[in-house]
Amino acid sequence: MTDACCLKGNEDKMVPRFGHGTWIGKAFNDTPEMLHERSLRQEKRLERANELMNDDSLQKLETAAMARSRSVDSAPLGNYTIWKNEYRRGKSFEDMLRLMQDQIIMARVYSGLAKFTNNLALHQEIETQLMKLAWEEESTDIDQEQRVLDSIRDMGQILARAHEQLYECKLVTNKLRAMLQTVEDELENEQTYITFLTQLASKALPDAIHCLTMRLNLEYHLLPLPMRNFPRRENLENPKLYHYALFSDNVLAASVVVNSTVMNAQDPSRHVFHLVTDKLNFGAMSMWFLLNPPGEATIHVQRFEDFTWLNSSYSPVLSQLESAAMKKFYFKTARSESVESGSENLKYRYPKYMSMLNHLRFYIPRIFPKLEKILFVDDDVVVQKDLTPLWSIDLKGKVNENFDPKFCGWAYGMNIFDLKEWKKNNITETYHFWQNLNENRTLWKLGTLPPGLITFYNLTQPLQRKWHLLGLGYDKGIDVKKIERSAVIHYNGHMKPWTEMGISKYQPYWTKYTNFDHPYIFTCRLFE
């Protein structure tokens, strides 16, 4: 083949001229205008090819890429040359499939180049073989292996001809770069969509827990009033005992927190759990712990709607949660025009953000006025060791002690609060001050961590890291040894252990404190 040249001869004869494997000479039925247009198109193609070859920026990128590739060991990829004798002897069926996938990539490159150079016959041949390869890849027939090998041979022959006719380094490189960009864009869109679905699913209550809650609610309302009282009420205000504050509307998660704490306590009789929920879950939460009391420990269940002092005139956040503007901001994310715009704001559309339960942590001294110290725990933690030493830690005049040694940033999950220092520093009033400033959500959108970081600024004392380990709800790479030596592990993140999205290797640390033989849990088919 002669590239972009003219063969001299008799002017009366048809003189073929080839460019990238495509004949652009005069045909018998060509008019002078058609021949001129064809010649112009070919000149434009050659001009574009020269531009690509002279593009310094592309040359620099390719040079850098080749330099990086020298340090990459390509031996694990093997040799996919099908015409070598050792290929059939040493390669597995999986290797043939990998070769097929490589061929598909190159076939798409040459198919595009064939169409670009107007070589429609080769373009159609490649597309036909691509369809055949795709069908073989999805096939599960018994004789699939032999047919795959035959298809690979056929495609290899077509690619060899395509390489001979169409190959030009710059054009192939740019085609591969364009394909890579397309794949990266598709991958980014898929990741956005996955993030959207993950956030959406993480905010929904699993059917099994909803079933459990409904059954417990029914049983509670059928229970006679005298049988609804918890024992050992005299321990609720005893400052010499170890008190826990747990605010939750998830009965199963709350049960794991209580069970894990009691089972790892040296003296369970000295531990008191103050559980606050809402009126919708009060019956279920009460019934569960009436049926499954935490051994010798004390437990008390309340609903925050019974706190008469907690009203919109006292609490700025309660007034804001009830406002039309807040509800509009919260619910408008459901009407996003696209997945991309919806996923950006979906994190704010979390039911707990519209629940006062999420903000009760700022009113702990008002809820428990006679206590001096209390350990606040979230419902997505598991306790693995005895926590009684936390009450003997000197907070050095600070309001709370948390796990992170950097006072400028910390997290909820487990915090020991000195309620006397809390009152002395007017923490609740400080919280109200910042909530009023954020009425229009200019400082932060929703949630309790931002106001918590501001309110407790410079009023925290660090704990040793062994007490609290974060990340089991999103980080799949946590060292098992770190998990096992931590006193409290925290499933913060979207992948909660009671959902199907939970990270499987971390779920046993949570499920070991769940009684799957309980008739209600068994009937509701949790984790089936």
UniProtKB/Swiss-Prot annotation:
UniProt keyword Glycosyltransferase, yes or no: yes
InterPro entries: GAUT (IPR029993), Glyco_trans_8 (IPR002495), Nucleotide-diphossugar_trans (IPR029044)
Keywords: Cell wall biogenesis/degradation, Glycosyltransferase, Transferase
Keyword flag Cell wall biogenesis/degradation: yes
GO molecular function, one term: polygalacturonate 4-alpha-galacturonosyltransferase activity
Pathway named in the protein's UniProt entry: Glycan metabolism; pectin biosynthesis
GO biological process, one term: pectin biosynthetic process
Pfam families: Glyco_transf_8
Entry EC number(s): 2.4.1.-
UniProt xrefs under SUPFAM superfamilies: Nucleotide-diphospho-sugar transferases
Highest taxon, organism lineage: Eukaryota
Chain's role: May be involved in pectin and/or xylans biosynthesis in cell walls.
Family affiliation: Belongs to the glycosyltransferase 8 family.
Note in the entry: Expression not detected in roots, inflorescences, siliques, leaves or stems. The signal-anchor present in all the other members of the family is missing.
Protein name per its UniProtKB record: Putative galacturonosyltransferase 2
Species assigned in the record: Arabidopsis thaliana
